[in-house]
Amino acid sequence: MTTSTGKINLLGLTQPEMEQFFDSIGEKRFRAGQVMKWIHHFGVSDFAAMTNVGKVLREKLEAVAEIRPPEVVSEDISADGTRKWVIRVASGSCVETVYIPTDDRGTLCVSSQAGCALDCSFCSTGKQGFNSNLTAAEVIGQVWLANKSFGTVPAKVDRAITNVVMMGMGEPLLNFDNVIAAMKIMMDDLGYGISKRRVTLSTSGVVPMIDELAKHIDVSLALSLHAPNDELRNKLVPINKKYPLKVLLESCMGYMSTLGGKRVLTVEYTLLKDVNDQPEHAAQMIELLRDVPCKINLIPFNPFPHSGYERPSNNAIRRFQDLLHHGGFNVTTRTTRGDDIDAACGQLVGQVNDRTRRSERYIAVRQLSADVELQDSAASH
């Protein structure tokens, strides 16, 4: 992608795209691998530092290309070791990236959009509306910046980042091409060499793009479910009105079967006090997912101002988990991490910007959606 300087940002190019770039400037394709290693393995953003690239080629690259990561506005470290970066992208909006360390892994939670158009009622990101899609360079740039912050080399065994989850701000499947490109760089040995089993894309349920996903990439899939029936999910996750549960689960099953192997869907379920945490909800969930190879990740709600929701008691959380476990499911309850720096699940809002502002583009998207719904309603009568 060409930046405001008129140069091509090499940070977001996949290996084939990098090879095409070197073709276009009359250079050998093997240079693509050299430059990708400098960028992603060693965190280099200055062509002058690429010691195995000749001076003439370095000067040529300086004239037509650049390596421009997004700008780090702030970095916060939680008492539990969780880190959160606020990052400003080219549109002027801010997004957030979170690193969660555990004993056996380091997981980076990456954003795909500034804001989100899906307006899930319990998610603070949705409250700020949709601002912009991130470029491939801005998506993979979050991985680049995190590695740079840790001073680690991705190719080493003791790498800081072992897993990446597309679970930050935004709906990844509504920024399809850029997210796919970034995930390819994550998994490329010339990029970050992360196993496909350790890269997870989370979706609220954009069915046409789930159906398209297997044609382009092989990664783990997570579904933001949050309700065991259509009536409740319509309220919590409004996209369910367009793609109800039966259609959505069929699409997820289709993705897993297309790729083959022992695929398991990760089901994410945010527990909201007295809303979706009752025994009858657990019973409905057991019935809904009975034939779906899945593991269930329960997420106790992380409060934010004016949400209108509360976190269930620990007893209610344990009861819900036990009911699902007795129903035959592999169930874990996510430990809240980074809530003291507003980095917990559902708390990402790009706080440097005015969180109440909705861009003209977002308003137009919502109006178009409303117009389509009115037309559909009129056609059905």
Curated annotation (Swiss-Prot):
Binds 1 [4Fe-4S] cluster. The cluster is coordinated with 3 cysteines and an exchangeable S-adenosyl-L-methionine. It is an enzyme of class 2 (transferase). InterPro entries: Aldolase_TIM, Methyltransferase_A, RlmN_N, RNA_MTrfase_RlmN, rRNA_lsu_MTrfase_RlmN/Cfr, rSAM. One of its GO terms (molecular function) is tRNA binding. S-adenosyl-L-methionine binds at G170, E171, S202, S224, L225, H226, N302. GO terms for cellular component: cytoplasm. Its main location: cytoplasm. Gene3D superfamilies: 1.10.150.530, Aldolase class I. Disulfide bonds join C109-C345. PROSITE patterns: RADICAL_SAM. [4Fe-4S] cluster binds at C116, C120, C123. Keywords: 4Fe-4S, Cytoplasm, Disulfide bond, Iron, Iron-sulfur, Metal-binding, Methyltransferase, rRNA processing, S-adenosyl-L-methionine, Transferase, tRNA processing. It catalyses: adenosine(2503) in 23S rRNA + 2 reduced [2Fe-2S]-[ferredoxin] + 2 S-adenosyl-L-methionine = 2-methyladenosine(2503) in 23S rRNA + 5'-deoxyadenosine + L-methionine + 2 oxidized [2Fe-2S]-[ferredoxin] + S-adenosyl-L-homocysteine; adenosine(37) in tRNA + 2 reduced [2Fe-2S]-[ferredoxin] + 2 S-adenosyl-L-methionine = 2-methyladenosine(37) in tRNA + 5'-deoxyadenosine + L-methionine + 2 oxidized [2Fe-2S]-[ferredoxin] + S-adenosyl-L-homocysteine. Its EC number is 2.1.1.192. One of its GO terms (biological process) is tRNA methylation. The active site is at E96 (proton acceptor), C345 (s-methylcysteine intermediate). Residues 102-342 form the Radical SAM core domain. It holds the Pfam family Radical_SAM. The keyword Methyltransferase applies. Belongs to the radical SAM superfamily. RlmN family. Specifically methylates position 2 of adenine 2503 in 23S rRNA and position 2 of adenine 37 in tRNAs. m2A2503 modification seems to play a crucial role in the proofreading step occurring at the peptidyl transferase center and thus would serve to optimize ribosomal fidelity. Reaction proceeds by a ping-pong mechanism involving intermediate methylation of a conserved cysteine residue. HAMAP family: RNA_methyltr_RlmN. PANTHER family: 23S RRNA METHYLTRANSFERASE, RADICAL SAM CORE DOMAIN-CONTAINING PROTEIN. This is Dual-specificity RNA methyltransferase RlmN. The gene is rlmN.
